[in-house]
Amino acid sequence: MTRIKLLLPLVILSAHTFLLWGQEISIDQNRVQIPVLKFKSFTPVLQFKINYTKELNVKKVLVEFEGTTNISNIGTVFLFDMGKDSTWQADRGNLVRQKALTNEHAVFTFSNPQQLKNNYFIVAVKLLDNTPLNHSISAGIKKVTFLESQPLTPSIDAKRVKQRIGVALRKGGDDGIVRYRIPGLASTNENTLLALYDVRRDRGSDLQGNIDIGVSRSTDGGNTWEPMRIALDMGEYGNLPQKFNGVSDACILVDKNSNAIYIAGCWMHGVIDSKTGRPATDLTAGSTNWNHQWRNYGSLPGFDINKTSQFLITKSIDDGKTWGDPINITKQVKSNEWHLSAPAPGSGITLDDGTLVFPTQGKDKDQIPFSNITYSKDGGQTWQAGKPSYSNTTENMIVQLSDGSIMQNMRDNRNRHEKSDSNGRAIFTTKNLGEYWEQHSTHHNALVEPVCMASIYKHTYTTINGYKKSIFLFSNPNSKYKRERMTVKVSFDEGKTWPEKYWLLLDELGLSGGYSSLTSINNNTIGILYEGSQAQMTFESIRLDELGINDAQLP
């Protein structure tokens, strides 16, 4: 006897799956923690995939925004067909529908059903410009309707997230600029936020190139920002094209005892041949010579501007509105035998005794990188450099401890290969402005890194009971392997421990350089500027209660 298997065209298995011609059809939904940004065309809020190897006819997609702080913050909802692209880069997909959001649901309908198979989709939103930074967005797929069957709900559903609101402060293409990199952030004595960054005009790579230092100001806690200003631009100095007069890696320092604000930058004039160690000659706008201050012979011993990178400082005395002509302090802070002395990007500090301190970095006589500090004890009139704290380290930031000493938190090149429990930031302290350094107990064992710039910052606040408290904050890509998972961490014991209970994940995607800079906005709020997955310069404000700190007075 011959047995015949009858294959039904459609079998309903559940609200999550059905069989069509013997093949199971289902929907996977995925959410990630990334910020939803103001002043940007759209930001992804969820991804879903329809699992079926043959063509299906989609009639309707229902998206819900239950749990969103205020639906009226969302102006437009977009649906992108990403094809087989599983990334979260919606601009690489095909926009198939968009509509204004009037309630907690967005319904995308297709009069001519879309024929799809195994496709990824992204739902994205555009925020209104007046969306408060303390709001959040939450989204999910309610159901998808097919011509062939009843509606389906997702069978694999990633954990629901509340996406924080941020600002797309700088995006590639803004003001005709190719790329913005290297954030710094500070609060002035007038409670103005100053954000600074590399303005990489022609291409995205590091020095040497046509790069200036840009500044953005905010007087409302980061909700809105004034147009970009340029703080450091060496133009066509020495009759060389701007591509051979780049300034990069800026650091900002607010003098807490005066109206002075300083920005330091690394200036390269011309370019040195990486093979011969000699300055290139006859450079023109069409010359393709390139080298970088950290590469072989990128910067040489001595002080000649044609041979060694220069340490520049500019000053503002009007709350960051205008910036003075640059002052070259290379001869004050660089040892003649060093190949390089340069600012470390981010922000500097004012010590309790009024000393101004920049985190700095360099290369010694053997071209081995090091970290150190550069300081002024006379209100910025003159500057001195401390001795190297540790070798084979570079970018760093500093905080003052309660005993008056300085803690330096450093990017360590050893971590390129060290992925064991010994992976961690290099940490040293000094009690005498870098004359001598001591290894800290958390050296190489507390804060993991993928070898990347990071930020450490001391925030002092008043409690509900009127007491003063200080906490340390740290931000970096929280990974040993990739520049992903931008995270803020808190220490209540001056950097000895960083309990995971007080970590806040801001952006888990690894689509950026991963640099960051922290500052205070007010008693109860922290600001961060970082290189994020959704904008080259992303700004967010963070309330202390979001970090698990609930005893701060509200402003």
Regions found by a protein language model. Give the residues of each.
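Bacterial Sec-dependent N-terminal signal peptides
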Residues: 1-23
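Compositionally biased, intrinsically disordered low-complexity segments
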Residues: 7, 14-15, 30, 402, ...
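Short alpha-helical "patches" and their helix-cap loops
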Residues: 9, 139-141, 361
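Local alpha-helix boundary/kink/capping signal
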Residues: 15, 72-74, 322, 365
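Exposed, polar/acidic Ser/Thr-rich sequence context and nearby capping/turn residues
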Residues: 23-163
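Asp-box/BNR beta-propeller blade signature and adjacent active/binding-site loops
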Residues: 42, 56, 84, 92-105, ...
